[in-house]
């Protein structure tokens, strides 16, 4: 049994980052370990708090009230490192897990912890592109890139979210790489049988991905040109945004239903009604290194996925087995994929739904990772 200090720029399990570390912590707790969260640079300036959530202790550290100090922290992490040192001295952990460190702190943390007999691991879920379009994004991306290429090999263990990151770390001599995709609280035991008639597809995404959404919308509009054969539920994008993208007024006539932003519970209900969910990613490093929670959630709900191949999380989708995989995500390629779906009978789709749940049970259940995580946090430096 070890005392684990989970450090990162996250909060309670209300965001993707918060949910990720919370799920990992639950697996560690199941193995008998004690997990404490140190949540850095919280948005409430100057305020610090300690709270209990589901039996976990959260230490919340607010940002500095000084903008200059916050900028300085982005470049060198001085303020955060002081907080980290104080917390380590107070809590006396056996091991530390750092979530997506982005302030060039890894070397400092290792140097501080190893002489004290504390092991250091990382939970890595992203690897940004180096884009100069936004200065601060570039600074963060550069820091992350430096850390992954230069510092992570010195860690005692790495928790990787994707096959892409795992392959990178293993090929660069990193020791003890553990691949853990997004963990789901529940995998459906029974599928919803496919209804006869019109097929239902669901897309849940952000308006910022409009360049990926537009070809899909065009494919839906074209395939429903004479009559509605496919209903496309769009979650996360408003009717006005879809109308602007497609330059049409009557979305329902084209089989498109836009929900806008909805609570997660409502989003799940929409996904559960679908025959396939939609996931299109750019063929860029960030997409390969990350792992879409929407993909794991869809499979856990027994819904196969129509996705494009980018060499990331899509590697767990086998074409015709637990989803449909296409090479491009242009409107022509998407339309051909939808036409394939329309040719499938209800029994074939039900089989793919069953395979989706089987994939989820083999990948996204926390207990699958209990022993390997427990070994990592309990090994000696």
Language-model-detected regions and their locations in the chain:
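Membrane-proximal helix-turn-helix segments that form the acceptor-binding/catalytic region
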Residues: 23, 81-86, 104-107, 111, ...
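A charged, aromatic-enriched C-terminal amphipathic alpha-helix characteristic of glycosyltransferases
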Residues: 346-377
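Donor nucleotide-sugar binding/catalytic pocket of nucleotide-sugar-dependent glycosyltransferases
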Residues: 39, 121, 129, 149-190, ...
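Nucleotide-sugar-dependent
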Residues: 15, 211, 265-270, 277-296, ...
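N-terminal subdomain of nucleotide-sugar transferases
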Residues: 1-46, 50-56, 157, 181, ...
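Nucleotide-activated donor-binding/catalytic signature segment of Leloir-type glycosyltransferases, i.e.
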Residues: 243-268
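Conserved donor-binding/catalytic core segment of Leloir-type glycosyltransferases
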Residues: 5, 159, 192-220, 233
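Conserved acidic donor-binding segment of nucleotide-sugar-dependent glycosyltransferases
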Residues: 319-320, 324-331, 340-346
